[in-house]
């Protein structure tokens, strides 16, 4: 379970403050206007930002100040951050061993996740030889191979065309269900959120303004629907 209690980040001396509980294995969408604090919330969970105050626990362990490298979290960005001089296999392997010295069990795990992502025939290629969708599959494989209990997505598929974006969302959702991972995804699209998350959180002005069923948001019946430009 992920729990944030009054986690506070000072942005130009103005506090953003978040309290949120997410159960293990739950898939939650984080929505809201541009500049509302959605990515800030994800970066606080990942450890890329250190809160001024508050408490963040994962499975009842305090991770408020745990460095990102030691936090049980993986994060995927729109910019996939693949190393251009490393092959697909090496980029995925970094998720298992930064020195790329993989034992037999790790090699097996790497090839299994590559097969799951549908990129097992691309392992010897460099990122520059791949399409945008293929690069995001590699980046997702690197996240999943780490087998951390929480996966954070910061609009990683927004640059993809609608059909490919839906394909990637389905792949992420099924992979998280298979590995029993908790998923939090920032998105500007309620439609995308509805594809994988039954529950949504709406962030506005550095606060969680609303949380509830994604379908309720999409129907325009929720109090926060207007924040997303949805009319009932």
Swiss-Prot record:
Positions bound to ATP: 32-39
Enzyme class: translocase
A cellular-component GO term for this protein: plasma membrane
Keywords: ATP-binding, Cell inner membrane, Cell membrane, Membrane, Nucleotide-binding, Translocase, Transport
Locations listed in the record: Cell inner membrane
Disulfide bond positions: none
Coiled-coil stretches: none
A Pfam cross-reference name: ABC_tran
Catalytic activity of the protein: thiamine(out) + ATP + H2O = thiamine(in) + ADP + phosphate + H(+)
PROSITE patterns (alphabetical): ABC_TRANSPORTER_1, ABC_TRANSPORTER_2, THIQ
Topology of this chain in the membrane: Peripheral membrane protein
Gene Ontology terms, MF aspect: ABC-type thiamine transporter activity; ATP binding; ATP hydrolysis activity
EC number, UniProt record: 7.6.2.15
Domain ABC transporter per the UniProt entry, residue ranges: 2-230
NCBIfam families: PRK10771.1 (NF008039), thiQ (TIGR01277)
Function: Part of the ABC transporter complex ThiBPQ involved in thiamine import. Responsible for energy coupling to the transport system.
Family note: Belongs to the ABC transporter superfamily. Thiamine importer (TC 3.A.1.19.1) family.
Subunit structure: The complex is composed of two ATP-binding proteins (ThiQ), two transmembrane proteins (ThiP) and a solute-binding protein (ThiB).
Protein name: Thiamine import ATP-binding protein ThiQ
Gene from which the chain derives: thiQ
């Amino acid at each position: 379970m992920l729990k944030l209690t009054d986690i506070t980040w000072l942005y130009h001396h103005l506090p953003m403050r978040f309290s949120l509980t997410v159960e293990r294995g739950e898939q939650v969408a984080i929505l809201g206007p541009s500049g509302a604090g959605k990515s800030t919330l994800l970066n606080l969970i990942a450890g890329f930002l250190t809160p001024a105050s508050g408490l963040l626990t994962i499975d009842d362990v305090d991770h408020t100040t745990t460095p990102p490298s030691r936090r049980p979290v993986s994060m995927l960005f729109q910019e996939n951050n693949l190393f251009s001089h490393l092959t697909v296999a090496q980029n995925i392997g970094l998720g298992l061993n930064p020195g790329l010295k993989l034992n037999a069990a790790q090699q097996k795990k790497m090839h299994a996740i590559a097969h799951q992502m549908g990129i097992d025939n691309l392992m010897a290629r460099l990122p520059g030889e791949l399409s945008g969708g293929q690069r995001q599959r590699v980046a997702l494989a690197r996240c999943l191979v780490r087998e951390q209990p929480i996966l954070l997505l910061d609009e990683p598929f927004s640059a993809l065309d609608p059909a490919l974006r839906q394909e990637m969302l389905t792949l992420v959702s099924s992979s998280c269900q298979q590995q029993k991972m908790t998923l939090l995804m920032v998105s500007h699209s309620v439609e995308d959120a509805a594809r994988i998350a039954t529950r949504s959180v709406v962030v506005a002005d550095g606060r969680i303004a609303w949380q509830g069923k994604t379908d309720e948001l999409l129907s325009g019946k929720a109090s926060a629907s207007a924040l997303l430009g949805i009319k009932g």
